[in-house]
């Protein structure tokens, strides 16, 4: 699986979800978006699960690497 890594920690909060959705849309089927965030992206997970048909929710993973660093993988079907 290949894909894109997007570190959103320095992006203003109001701009994060649109940028994430754009990056995800640019992926090929079978690729994944790796997201680095300052909090667990659970609201984004639920948003993607409800709104993005190509999101493979079963393949989603998240790892806390530090107090302000979460790395989540959003695979695309």
Describe every region a protein language model picked out.
Residues 1-29:
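An N-terminal amphipathic alpha-helical segment
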Residues 24-59:
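Short, hydrophobic/π-rich interface segment
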Residues 57-77:
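C-terminal edge-of-domain segments
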Residues 19-23, 48-50, 75-77:
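Surface-exposed beta-strand edges and their flanking turn/coil or helix-capping segments
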Residues 3, 30-34, 69-71:
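Intrinsic-disorder/low-complexity, polar/charged segments enriched in Ser/Thr/Lys/Arg/Asp/Glu/Gln
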Residues 12-17, 33, 50, 68:
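A generic structural micro-environment signature
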Residues 1, 28, 55, 65-67:
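A generic structural signal for short, non-catalytic loop/turn and secondary-structure boundary residues
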């Amino acid at each position: 699986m290949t894909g894109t890594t997007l570190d959103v920690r320095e992006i203003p909060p109001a701009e994060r979800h649109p940028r994430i959705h754009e990056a995800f849309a640019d992926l090929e089927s079978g690729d994944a978006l790796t997201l680095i965030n300052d909090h667990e992206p659970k609201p984004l997970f639920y948003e993607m699960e409800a709104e993005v048909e190509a999101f493979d929710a079963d393949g989603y993973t998240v790892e806390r690497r530090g107090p302000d660093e979460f790395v989540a993988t959003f695979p695309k079907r």
